C-alpha cells in the first residue's frame, strides 16, 4: 500500500512528507471493514492524527478517480494505478519502514481437484512475489 496524491493536490510536487502533514487532510477510503482501511486507520491512530474521510467507496477505480479529480488523498495498492503513475497523473509516497506492506496467501483444500487456472494463478504469484516501487516514489516519514 502507498499514499497517493493526484496531480492537482499540493503534495504532488513534494518528495518527502511527514506523517504530521496528513493531519486534517481529506481522504477517499475503502468502506468500513476493509482491511486496507483498517490498516491505515491504525496508522492514523498510532500517529495521533485526525483525517477527514470525504469519499467512501468499495470500488478502487472510484477511489482513484476521487484522487485524480477531487484533490483528496488515499492509501491504495500500487498495483491498481500503474497507468496513472506512468503518465505522471499521480504521485505516490511509501512509508519509510514499509509498515503498510501486506502478504497474501493462496489457500486451497489439499484434497480437492485443482483446475489448470489455479495452477496458472499459482505460477503467476510465484513469478511476481514483490512489486518494485517506481524510482520517483516519495517518502513518508514519521
Model-derived segments and spans:
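Flexible hinge/capping segments at coil-to-helix
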Residues: 1-27, 31-32, 116
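Residues embedded in well-ordered beta-strands
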Residues: 2-4, 10, 73, 91, ...
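Short secondary-structure boundary/capping segments
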Residues: 1, 18-20, 45-46, 82, ...
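A late-sequence structural motif
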Residues: 91-135
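Hydrophobic hinge/microswitch elements
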Residues: 33-93
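Ligand-binding clefts/hinges and TM-proximal coupling segments of bilobed small-molecule sensing domains
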Residues: 33-39, 43, 47-49, 119, ...
Amino acid at each position: 500500500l502507498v499514499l497517493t496524491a493526484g496531480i492537482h493536490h499540493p503534495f504532488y510536487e513534494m518528495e518527502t512528507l511527514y506523517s504530521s502533514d496528513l493531519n486534517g487532510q481529506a481522504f477517499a477510503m475503502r468502506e468500513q471493514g476493509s482491511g486496507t482501511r483498517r490498516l491505515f486507520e491504525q496508522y492514523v491512530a498510532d500517529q495521533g492524527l485526525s483525517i477527514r474521510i470525504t469519499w467512501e467507496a468499495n470500488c478502487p477505480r472510484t477511489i482513484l478517480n476521487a484522487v485524480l479529480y477531487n484533490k483528496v488523498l488515499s492509501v491504495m495498492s500500487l498495483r491498481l494505478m500503474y497507468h496513472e503513475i506512468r503518465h505522471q497523473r499521480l504521485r505516490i509516497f511509501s512509508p519509510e519502514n514499509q509498515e503498510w506492506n501486506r502478504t497474501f496467501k493462496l489457500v486451497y483444500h489439499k484434497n480437492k481437484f485443482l483446475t489448470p487456472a489455479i495452477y496458472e494463478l499459482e505460477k503467476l504469484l510465484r513469478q511476481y512475489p514483490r512489486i518494485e516501487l517506481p524510482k520517483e516514489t516519495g517518502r513518508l516519514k514519521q
